Design a protein with these regions (language model features):
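A charged N-terminal "starter" segment
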Residues: 1-131, 170, 174-178, 211
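Glycine-rich tight-turn/loop motif centered on a GG-T
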Residues: 18, 84-90, 104-112, 147-160, ...
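Active-site beta-loop-alpha junctions enriched in small/polar residues
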Residues: 27-28, 45-51, 68-71, 96-98, ...
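Structural preference for beta-strand elements that scaffold enzyme active sites
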Residues: 41-43, 62-65, 88-92, 110-112, ...
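Structured alpha-helical segments in the cores of large, soluble enzyme domains
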Residues: 76, 161-177, 202-216, 248-249
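Active-site glycine- and acidic-residue-rich loops that bind
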Residues: 112-123, 154-164, 188-201, 236, ...
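Flexible glycine-/small-residue-enriched beta->alpha junction loops
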Residues: 131-164
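C-terminal active-site-proximal or functional interface alpha/beta core segments in diverse enzymes
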Residues: 192-301
Length: 301
């Protein structure tokens, strides 16, 4: 990993603006976006960084946005993203549950919903016939660089359980909703062998949707692309990553008989290496064998 900032620059910024201070390098973000240009749609998981100026930069680069809360939908709108049922939509809302205020917001602005529970489909259909939805499917397995980032398998609350796909598709048909696509995000960190398994699972889901008589327009590879946290850590091979998913997309297209969009939903991959947090040391103290350095940034360890 590289550091785009010189010590002198950071000192000057701290002197000019004070601390604590977040500093981002736009060129690094643009470079990361360019690495993923082979995907039809790059959709930024803004939970990684919902700074309005970062969101505006994403929009200027042609990146779409994913929101996981009503607040994130409003931030996307404030950054200039256009709501609506486009293909691809500029804003998609992803969640496993919706409160009434969030439901009203996605209906008002025609924001497609990436549903992680079947109940969401009925709630949406009751107030917004024709609404576009994605189905986030839990394939029954997961992967992550830690248990906290593993979002697949029976111990994860995220996504509709794979065996309930047909029930979800029936809810879409019965509710007069429109299926935009199928989504699968099972965790953070990249293992190419495991990724191949995920791609195969997606193709099988598309086959089942075809059998159920429900068409779709796209598939989403989710996110979780890894970054190097320290010198010597491996970097992701984005060309290989795309190649695996593109092969799966082509298999899925053969099933449905028409072209399918291929989305990717990176978060930290686009921003984590672009920013630094500047703080000022305000105190130091000892506690037995431990030495603490106290800064003005809060608990951001």
């Amino acid at each position: 990993m590289s550091n785009p900032f010189t010590p002198a620059l950071l000192w000057n910024l701290a002197d000019e603006f004070g601390t604590p201070l977040w500093v981002y390098d736009a060129a690094t973000i643009r470079e990361r976006i360019a690495q993923l240009k082979a995907f039809d749609t790059v959709r930024f998981a803004q939970k990684a960084c919902s700074n309005i100026h970062i969101l505006k930069l994403m929009r200027e680069q042609g990146v779409k946005v994913d929101a996981v809360s009503r607040g994130e939908i409003l931030r996307a709108l404030a950054a200039g993203f256009t709501p609506g049922f486009g293909e691809p939509a500029e804003i998609v809302f992803t969640a496993d549950v919706m409160d009434e205020a969030t439901l009203a917001t996605v209906v008002e602005h025609k924001v497609p919903v990436n549903a992680g529970s079947i109940d969401m489909l009925g709630q949406l259909a009751a107030v917004s016939k024709g609404h576009h939805v994605w189905l986030r499917i839990n394939p029954g397995f997961g992967h992550g660089h830690s248990n906290k980032t593993n979002t697949g398998g029976e111990h994860s609350k995220h996504g509709i359980w794979h065996s309930e796909l047909e029930e979800a598709l029936e809810a879409i048909k019965a509710g007069g909703l429109v299926l935009a696509g199928l989504h699968m995000h099972i965790g953070s960190g990249v293992d190419y062998g495991h990724l191949q398994e995920v791609c195969g699972a997606m193709v099988k889901l598309v086959e089942r949707a075809k059998t159920a008589g429900v068409d779709l327009h796209a598939i989403s590879a989710g996110g979780g692309l890894s970054i190097p946290y320290k010198k010597g850590d491996a970097t992701i091979d984005t060309a290989h990553y795309h190649g695996l998913w593109d092969a799966a997309r082509k298999q899925a297209e053969a099933v449905v008989g028409h072209s399918l969009g291929l989305e990717l939903e990176p978060g930290r991959f686009l921003v984590a290496e672009s920013g630094v947090l500047l703080g000022t040391v305000r105190a130091t103290k000892n506690a037995g064998s431990n030495h603490f350095v106290l800064v003005d940034t809060g608990f951001n360890e």
